């Protein structure tokens, strides 16, 4: 077949596809109006930098997993607060029935506007998620957690009954249905997950996440949250140092790490991560135990430097702008970013194996 004939056949096929499935169902990638990944800040400057694109990508699935009390829910609630600050709508599916309104409020979440569901079964929770995403009016959806999405058959059965693979099949079916809708509606879907240990594993990592393999494949970003150390004020424990590792990233290089202070009752310490990032870029100078900004000493010890920035908002804002510029994190608000409703990027699993 000659080159002209091949091109004519291709053009005819493209016209037929657009006629059958609508304009925008197929296009050359260079013809897309916007190729920039649209994002929303995670609420943590250090995590935004680790994600590589300045936050969570819109229209994608994100998995946050880790041990108990490591800070997974805190990370998710900060993202909810950021979406609400920009005037967006947030929904929270609390399958664990453990939402603390007081703590959420302390993190900046407007609980009056937060859509909350506490489903009875896994099927119900995922149906609610599908309905919310399909509406196109929800900017971020949090499912807390995948491990708590118990299939109806297990709820209605007897204790001790074997239900092999039920949850994995449920998640696989749900994600096949949800992934395309999430992409088209530009919803950020955050799935919080726990970890389990395989019995009898002698070599390698015995830790696995519940719900089968489907979520691993469909996720654009996977974050591993672990508690690194305890933060103390004298003998009092006032928080945890959390290590957030980007173990999978389809929109930027993976394996970057963000370390943040999660203070009890307050969430992620913005001044703590700001001090660390500013020191790394020599915006704040550290000599011995003393921290100084310009010609002024701002504290002896990291905690005192954090307190200084918290007490001097003008200095904090100035340092934050310099840090964002040094790390190349955009200052453009989300609403000012170019968007397109016709953008069609399929979220395909990495592998055909889903369970």
UniProtKB/Swiss-Prot annotation:
Record region (Disordered): 331-355
Record-linked SMART domains: AAA (SM00382)
Residues where ATP binds: 66-73
Location within or outside the cell: Cytoplasm
Annotated keywords: ATP-binding, Cytoplasm, DNA damage, DNA recombination, DNA repair, DNA-binding, Nucleotide-binding, SOS response
A single GO cellular-component term on record: cytosol
Source taxon at top rank: Bacteria
Record field: compositional bias (Acidic residues): 332-344
GO biological process entries: DNA recombination; DNA repair; SOS response
Gene3D superfamilies assigned to the protein according to its UniProt record, in alphabetical order: P-loop containing nucleotide triphosphate hydrolases (3.40.50.300)
A Gene Ontology molecular function term of the record: ATP-dependent DNA damage sensor activity
UniProt cross-references to InterPro entries, sorted A to Z: AAA+_ATPase (IPR003593), DNA_recomb/repair_RecA (IPR013765), DNA_recomb/repair_RecA_CS (IPR020584), P-loop_NTPase (IPR027417), RecA-like_C (IPR049261), RecA-like_N (IPR049428), RecA_ATP-bd (IPR020588), RecA_C_sf (IPR023400)
Family statement: Belongs to the RecA family.
Purpose: Can catalyze the hydrolysis of ATP in the presence of single-stranded DNA, the ATP-dependent uptake of single-stranded DNA by duplex DNA, and the ATP-dependent hybridization of homologous single-stranded DNAs. It interacts with LexA causing its activation and leading to its autocatalytic cleavage.
Entries under HAMAP family matching the protein: RecA
Protein name: Protein RecA
């Amino acid at each position: 077949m000659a080159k002209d004939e091949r091109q004519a056949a291709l053009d005819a096929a493209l016209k037929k596809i657009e006629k059958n499935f609508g304009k925008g169902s197929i296009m050359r990638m260079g013809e897309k109006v916007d190729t920039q990944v649209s994002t929303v800040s995670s609420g943590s400057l250090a995590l935004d930098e680790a994600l590589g694109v300045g936050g969570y990508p819109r229209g994608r699935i994100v998995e946050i997993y880790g041990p108990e009390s490591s800070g997974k829910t805190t990370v998710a609630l900060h993202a909810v607060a950021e979406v609400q600050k920009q005037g967006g709508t947030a929904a929270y599916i609390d399958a664990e029935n453990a939402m603390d309104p007081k703590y959420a409020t302390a993190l900046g979440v407007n609980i009056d506007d937060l859509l909350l569901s506490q489903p009875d079964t896994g099927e119900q929770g995922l149906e609610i998620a599908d309905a919310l995403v399909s509406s196109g009016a929800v900017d971020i959806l949090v499912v807390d957690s995948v491990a708590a999405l118990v299939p109806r058959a297990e709820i209605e059965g007897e204790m001790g009954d074997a239900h092999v693979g039920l949850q994995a099949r449920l998640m696989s079916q749900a994600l096949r249905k949800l992934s395309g809708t999430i992409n088209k509606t530009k919803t950020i879907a955050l799935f919080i997950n726990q970890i389990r240990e395989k019995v009898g594993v002698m070599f390698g990592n015995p830790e696995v996440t519940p719900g089968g393999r489907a979520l691993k494949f469909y996720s654009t970003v996977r974050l591993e949250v672990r508690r690194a150390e305890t933060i103390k004020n004298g003998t009092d424990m006032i928080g945890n140092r959390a290590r957030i590792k980007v173990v999978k990233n389809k929109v930027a290089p993976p394996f970057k790490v963000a370390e943040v202070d999660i203070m009890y009752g307050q969430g992620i310490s913005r001044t703590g991560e700001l001090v660390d990032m500013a020191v790394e870029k020599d915006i704040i100078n550290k000599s011995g135990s003393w921290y100084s900004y310009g010609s002024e000493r701002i504290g002896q010890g990291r905690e005192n430097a954090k307190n200084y920035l918290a007490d001097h908002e003008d200095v904090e804002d100035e340092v934050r702008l310099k840090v964002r510029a040094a790390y190349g994190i955009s200052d453009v608000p989300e609403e000012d970013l170019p968007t397109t409703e016709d953008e069609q990027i399929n979220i395909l699993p990495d592998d055909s194996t889903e369970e």
